[in-house]
Amino acid sequence: MATTSPCAAPSPSLRCPLALSHPFASPPPPPALRLAGPKLLPGRLAVSPPPGIPAVASALESLILDLDDDEEDEDEETEFGLFQGEAWAAADEREAVRSPELVVPELEELPEQWRRSRIAWLCKELPAYKHSTFTRILNAQRKWITQDDATYVAVHCLRIRNNDAAFRVYSWMVRQHWFRFNFALATRVADCLGRDGKVEKCREVFEAMVKQGRVPAESTFHILIVAYLSVPKGRCLEEACTIYNQMIQMGGYKPRLSLHNSLFRALVSKTGGTAKYNLKQAEFVYHNVVTTNLDVHKDVYAGLIWLHSYQDVIDRERIIALRKEMKQAGFDEGIDVLVSVMRAFSKEGNVAETEATWHNILQSGSDLPVQAYVCRMEAYARTGEPMKSLDMFKEMKDKNIPPNVASYHKIIEIMTKALEVDIVEQLMNEFIESDMKHLMPAFLDLMYMYMDLDMHEKLELTFLKCIARCRPNRILYTIYLESLVKVGNIEKAEEVFGEMHNNGMIGTNTKSCNIMLRGYLSAEDYQKAEKVYDMMSKKKYDVQADSLEKLQSGLLLNKKVIKPKTVSMKLDQEQREILIGLLLGGTRMESYAQRGVHIVHFQFQEDSNAHSVLRVHIHERFFEWLSSASRSFDDGSKIPYQFSTIPHQHFSFFVDQFFLKGQPVLPKLIHRWLTPRVLAYWFMFGGSKLPSGDIVLKLSGGNSEGVERIVNSLHTQSLTSKVKRKGRFFWIGFQGSNAESFWRIIEPHVLNNFASLVTQEGSSIGSDGTQDTDTDSDDDMQMSDTERDE
């Protein structure tokens, strides 16, 4: 029998009055919901939030360590990004957002003694049990329990801050025939889950309110947004923006200043190249702050100008307007603003404005930032004066300002475009000797210059230097491949092309295939050229018109005619196995408007190097299945982290097997499909290799029976595993010799050098940050250790 602490006993008084003016709520029957109530009394049910949102642990830490779920971090919201150290997103304002009052009858008010006793017993025993036993106990009460009784139990769980137990009770309630939607209870459950960092469960209750035709309370919007923003590494920023927009557009609420500022801070917390896509949302936040007559923080102006400076097309008028508004508000332009202005002007090649802003930086008496010199170099380069850019670089070093990676990248880019070979080689040697990282962009610029100058021997030497120091990529190999074709070394080009095709970390694309096709045509090897053409047709790559004409002419000489081939859209065996592995790791599928047609949504973590590599590989492997918008990226670095396939009936089998009513499940025959390639892609997408050598796999969806089939299937391959359940996900772990055996099985199908990437990111598991946020709960943890058979 499970035991509980004395504090688990139910309180005789379970009232939780909090008031919120809610214009969209229809008058409900008392006493279930009271829109105007007294202040919260200490002796009553206190389910108000703790001072801050608990730090949401990573999925891996939740699996390996026994974390304290009650640990809180009051400074969680003031330690990130542009606004570090600012207290204008404080928790006390979060506390001020109030939710509807929930009133529950006192236990002694219930007429039957036996009912009071049973409810008291449930309140005492239920919180100690895990999911399976928890549900069985509730099912055993169906003959007598009512909605009011279950509401009392749920609210008691909230009082003792066992929010997972409260969510289980509430989820069980909504499945009963007697359930009637209770807006106040749903709001309270969602708010408590959000404060506890359980964003998925909070979002589930939130969406249930919307489906009931109710607008969630302001507190629910506010708490859910803050919970999303608290997810590590900003993985749920997009979801936070979605809820924020709904809060204003659907709810008609006016968020507090702290919420505006917290969201804006998250939008500008990433690097410029990534954050520039957040400009539209940042402008929307700024618009809402201004139109609600709230004070605009200085860093909001600075952040907006910073975002505008990274845009491909500079909105000069908007930057001028923001600077004017900033001055009218009484704020001085700091160094960060001046550097952003220089960056914007330099992209336009406006030397006069760039130098004028530079003069303002000099007058400020502050330390001269390296980025300001980079902007000056950019401005002079755009006006056709690359040697002045070089003078800027030398001036920076003369003033004992150490160059950084960005400055080396910029000056090498400028000098390679100017075809200054000796200067570029000298700069490149300095860069390499500095032991700085991120050499790849400089190597690529150098190789492009050698290509333009037909210096193919130096290009090959640069290629060899690069692969010795950097992780190879498709662009690097494509440049080298084109160089080999230009000099007529088709045999070597064929070898390089084969390496690209066989190495999943590199892969081929439209450009590399066209280069190889031109190479075979120049060598008049029409048989091999036809094979490349067939491969391109299958992958739906665009064939250059002149190459197609030469191929047709060459084959005509051999009395062979190329006819347009109708490519049958069918997943090959490798693609099917890859897709199964990704689905086990959490890839989503959805139905299209047309019946029997489905779409696969590939989504990867932007903050994961391992997922970045896997993203390029999956994009290349499923290229023919992707939508036209997703296929338009030839440069691997520009491939989005989210892309989808075309709707096709061929995916129906996988939807039927892996999804039930939109929720992920495990197929009954999954134990037969666990081939080495399936396991490898499951590991690469939703797994991790710990520094100790242990391997962990995250399993999305399914129940204990399905997981047991997987464990037993692995056991037949002499792989003993342990399974833990955390929240809604199962974690399958291999330790010691079992991890070594598992690695030997999957290693032939794992991308080259992928293990080192996934080991470094041991705490980043899965495809979606939101999936990791509920794993720190005290949810049931089922041990399915196959050693029990021994």
Swiss-Prot record:
Keywords: Chloroplast, mRNA processing, mRNA splicing, Plastid, Repeat, Transit peptide
Location of this chain's protein in the cell: Plastid, Chloroplast
Gene Ontology CC, one term: chloroplast
GO biological-process terms attached to the record: Group II intron splicing; mRNA cis splicing, via spliceosome; photosystem I assembly
Pfam family, one: PPR_3
UniProt GO MF annotations: endonuclease activity
PPR repeat feature ranges: 182-216, 217-254, 256-296, 299-333, 334-368, 369-403, 404-438, 439-469, 473-507, 509-543
Regions of compositional bias (Acidic residues) in chain numbering: 771-790
Region (Disordered): 762-790
UniProt cross-references to Gene3D superfamilies, sorted A to Z: Homing endonucleases, Tetratricopeptide repeat domain
Major place of residence: plastid
Gene null: resulting phenotype: Chlorophyll deficiency and seedling lethality when grown under normal light or low light.
Range annotated as the organelle transit peptide: 1-56
Job description of the protein: Promotes the splicing of group II introns in chloroplasts. Required for the splicing of intron 2 of plastid ycf3 transcripts, a factor required for the assembly of photosystem I (PSI). Involved in the splicing of atpF, ndhA, petB and rps16 chloroplastic transcripts. Required for the assembly of PSI.
NCBIfam families: PPR
Family the entry assigns: Belongs to the PPR family. P subfamily.
UniProt-recorded name of the protein: Pentatricopeptide repeat-containing protein OTP51, chloroplastic
Organism: Oryza sativa subsp. japonica
Gene name of the encoded protein: OTP51
